[in-house]
A protein has these predicted regions:
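Conserved histidines in hydrophobic membrane contexts and catalytic metal-binding motifs
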Residues: 1-161
Length: 161
């Protein structure tokens, strides 16, 4: 699964890099924005979906509709970000907001469902809940590390446009 995703991203970036001389053409710019929309938008939309899942009460009847709608709205927001600013700024924005949403999910658990918070899950030995919250925190940290790497390696060298 994850290796397949890495292969997709690598292939798309290689295709994009190979055609960098064509960057003024509409097709190249469109593919660049669609790559942004796919590879940065999907993780953000997935994290947003999980956040909405934690916010909406389980007893709420049309819960699934709201969760799926939230996913697509977040994904479309990434497309809007892609087309409304430069790719460089868009990448920074998407990395920041994805990290923020990932960090917010465990915080929402503390506020809305205190018995399912990370500390209470540790005390009551609910390892599945602990694993999910820790994975979300680690993913949020990963996004911040990627953001820092992107800002220091690519922006300072002027390679990201």
């Amino acid at each position: 699964g994850i290796i397949g995703c890495v292969m997709l991203v690598a292939g798309a970036l290689l295709w994009q890099t190979k055609r960098i001389k064509e960057q003024k053409k509409f097709g190249y710019r469109l593919v660049r924005h669609l790559n942004f929309f796919t590879f940065l938008g999907l993780p953000f939309a997935s994290a947003f979906y999980l956040m909405v899942n934690r916010i909406i009460p389980a007893s709420f009847e049309p819960r699934e509709l709201y969760e799926v709608s939230a996913f697509y709205i977040a994904w479309l927001l990434s497309l809007l970000i892609s087309f409304s600013c430069s790719i460089r700024k868009g990448i920074i924005i998407m990395l920041y907001i994805t990290a923020a949403v990932l960090f917010l999910i465990p915080v929402i658990s503390v506020v809305l469902v205190p018995e399912a918070s990370l500390l209470n899950s540790l005390k009551s030995v609910h390892w599945s809940l602990v694993g999910v919250d820790l994975a979300l925190i680690l993913l949020g940290l990963f996004y911040l590390v990627v953001l820092r790497f992107y800002q220091t390696k690519f922006i300072t060298l002027g390679e990201a446009k």
